[in-house]
Amino acid sequence: MRIGLIGSGQMGNRVEEVAQERGDTILLLQTASKEATTLVFPELPELLIDFSHPDNLEKILSYSLSYQLPLVIGTTGYTQSQFQEIKEHAKHVPVMYSANFSFGIMVMNQLIKQAAAMLQGWQIELIEKHHSRKKDAPSGTANMLLQTIQEVQKLQPVYNWQGKKREENQIGVHSIRAGSLPGEHDVLFAATDEIFTIKHESFSNRIFAAGAVEAADWLKDQSPGYYKLEDLLMDKGV
């Protein structure tokens, strides 16, 4: 594949590393300034992978549409209106968005959905831990897991409990930022005298890069549409 890579941070570097190990060609963005009105690559990519910033969305969508390039998005922090733009864009080209490209997290997400449906009345807590340099809290993955739970149970999130007792129909959401923790997500279901926990730990952001590259390889053969990582897993029979 000829991958147009947008984003030169940790995740962008990991994607470049993983793709080159596979024998793919990475085309690095040649205009990275905020003032640039379009994207420029050394040659035309076959598809785009974005791990950059929400501010870049307009020019990314414009470039993708102009050349009909499939688009894999791993950037988090979009507004609801930006998500609507992405979904509208997906009517014309295949798009996959995921806050987390770990296949383990996707399986965890499905397990949480089942548990939330089966354990009605249990109290639920969501705890996520990341390194001290992470800029957003809760993480995009935590928000994804929360949304999955809320699709099953109408719970109101309370962020980092403080100074009041728990009420019905609430879910606690907690963020920890310390050291070099690569990423951990725990969803705890609690009832009287028992606790059930679903947990995922990542030890390197390489898993997210590998998932994004595999997603791109799958997405390039799909019709226009808005895809999630679960679609790839289902296609593989996972």
Model-derived regions, located:
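Short acidic/histidine-rich motifs immediately flanking catalytic phosphotransfer sites
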Residues: F41-I49, S66-L71
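Short, acidic/turn-prone active-site loops that include or flank metal/cofactor-
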Residues: A32-A36, T76-T79, N100-F101
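Aromatic/hydrophobic pocket-lining residues that form π-stacking "cages" and hydrophobic walls in ligand
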Residues: V15, I60, I86, L111, ...
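C-terminal substrate-binding/catalytic lobe of Rossmann-fold NAD(P)-dependent oxidoreductases
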Residues: R2, I6, Q10-P42, Q120-V238
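Residues at the C-terminal ends
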Residues: E21, L65-S66
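Rossmann-fold NAD(P)-binding glycine/threonine-rich loop
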Residues: D55, S62, T75-V95, M106, ...
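Rossmann-fold dehydrogenase core element
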Residues: P70, E85-S102, A116-I124
